[in-house]
A protein has these predicted regions:
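Short helix-initiation/N-cap motifs at beta->coil->alpha
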Residues: 71-82, 188-193, 265-278
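Hinge/lid segment of periplasmic solute-binding proteins
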Residues: 99-154, 303-312, 383-394
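Short, solvent-exposed loop/beta-turn-alpha elements that line the ligand-binding surface or hinge
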Residues: 115-127, 171-187, 231-251, 297-301, ...
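C-terminal lobe and pocket-closing loops
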Residues: 290-303, 315-421
Length: 450
């Protein structure tokens, strides 16, 4: 039986934010001035922060703007906690990073940037649809594309281990550049195939990995597994539907899959995937290519065996998390004109291209034209083609945790880590599947009540 609640109740329960607060009118000039404080994501890829700061400072010098940049790590939910503190206090950075659902969560304190987006799209072309879904709140753009940080969470696996212990040639299924995929091989890569491979790899001491603590990376891999099985927590109408056969089925599956992982996954933070692959024990994780990037420096013998590829197919399709990252302007900024000019600047192809070269393709552009003609994913190695399949190239559907719930509710599903907490309770916490579902339903009802 499915539990139902109206969309209106969900929106009422999760909208604990007031009316939008607009900054004082400003006069846009051809030459920005003043000072901008920026809080941006502390990038995983070595050298990225320094390269980004050079680009920002160069723009500042050319436009008479003093730029101050703070790089804020995602570990420990520091990005979200800092945003919450600044939003409540009405003081902090001028420009702040807003990933995934944060434009929805902080829409009441974010300056509208419709004019910025209009200029960027007029110059650069359209963004991926998911960007509008996340950053355009109630018809108003609240954030603009970040030049760094947008990413997908496909799989990254060890070619040698899959061949040796699971008899699977991942390069044959998901080949590199200038090679055509075999649709039959791709179709056969489903969640049953992953489970069978994971069991063999685990028995050989090389299990797959996926965090199950209350961390972003945990939601990023669990949510697509749910989606592929047609399992939803809240549907597109805002009704709580966690009490379903589809959810029971996916929890039964995950109870088996988790046994192919190390017990430490329940304590992993957002660096856990990297550590697992660089240790030499890991055979697969669900992650951007940061393990490969770091391994090139710290464990090159493992890096040369790593390969990015698609997630498995489930009964309801193949899904992958696409994690857009935006920059927004707090409405308490005292230099909104300069902040908007800077957002326009970093929304250009030249800036995106430069940063993609620095990150060796870790960042996936939100503007479609910025990915076209960029050969960074084809050129990167070793091995040649290692990250070619990191951008979505096949039949995967890009989603974000909480999909397909209305954005206000989906934002809370992500913030409350309901996906990994539910899986953890069932696979390690002693709850039966029915007990876990009842817990999740209660949590979702509490979110609705605000």
């Amino acid at each position: 039986m499915r539990k139902g609640h109206t969309r209106r109740k969900v929106l009422q329960g999760t909208t604990a934010i007031g009316l939008s607060t607009f900054a004082s009118p400003y006069i846009k000039t051809s030459h920005s001035a003043g000072k901008l404080k920026m809080g941006v994501w502390d990038h995983w890829i070595p050298g990225t922060n320094g390269a980004l700061e050079v680009l920002l400072q160069k723009w500042g010098e050319a436009n008479g703007v003093e730029i101050e940049v703070d790089f804020i790590p995602s570990a420990g939910n520091k990005l979200l906690l800092t945003a919450q503190a600044e939003s409540r206090a009405g003081i902090g950075h001028d420009i702040y990073v807003h990933a995934i659902w944060m434009p929805t969560m902080f829409a009441h304190r974010l300056e509208p940037v419709d004019d910025v987006i209009e200029d960027i799209i007029s110059s650069e072309g359209p963004m991926v649809p998911l960007a509008e879904y996340l950053a355009k709140v109630d018809g108003v753009w609240r954030a603009s594309p970040s030049p760094v940080g947008s990413q997908t969470h496909g799989m990254i696996s060890r070619l040698d281990l899959y061949k040796k212990y699971a008899d699977i040639n991942l390069q044959e299924i998901f080949p590199g550049p200038k090679q055509k995929r075999n649709s039959e091989l791709v179709d056969a890569w489903d969640y049953d195939a992953l489970l069978e491979a994971g069991q063999k790899l685990h028995a050989a001491g090389h299990g797959i990995g996926g965090p199950l603590a209350a961390t972003g990376d945990a939601s990023f891999w669990v949510a697509p597994v749910f989606a592929a099985h047609g399992a939803e927590l809240v549907d597109k109408n805002g009704d709580i539907v966690v009490d379903s056969e589809e959810v029971r089925t996916v929890l039964e599956y995950l109870s088996k899959l988790v046994r192919t992982m190390p017990e430490s996954v329940y304590a992993w933070d957002d660096a856990g995937n990297n550590r697992w692959m660089i240790s030499g024990q890991g055979s697969s994780v669900f992650n951007p290519p940061s393990p490969w990037n770091v391994a090139k420096r710290d464990a090159p013998q493992f890096a040369e065996q790593m390969w990015c590829h698609d997630l498995p197919r489930g009964p309801h399709g193949r899904y992958r998390n696409f994690i857009p990252q935006f920059w927004g302007i707090w409405d308490f900024s005292e230099n909104i004109a300069a902040a908007k000019d800077l957002l326009r600047h970093v929304g250009t192809r030249d800036i995106t291209y430069q940063m993609s070269q620095v990150t060796t393709g870790y960042d996936v552009p939100l503007l479609r034209s910025h990915a076209e003609g960029n050969d960074v994913w084809a050129k990167a190695g070793p091995p040649p083609g290692a990250i070619y399949n990191y951008p979505i190239r096949g039949d995967e559907i890009g989603i974000v945790p909480g999909y397909p719930a209305p954005p206000p509710m989906a934002a809370q599903i992500m913030a409350q880590a309901i996906f990994p907490n539910l899986v953890s309770r069932v696979t390690a916490g002693g709850d039966s599947i029915d007990e876990g579902i009842r817990w999740a339903a209660n949590e979702l009802e509490a979110v609705m009540r605000g």
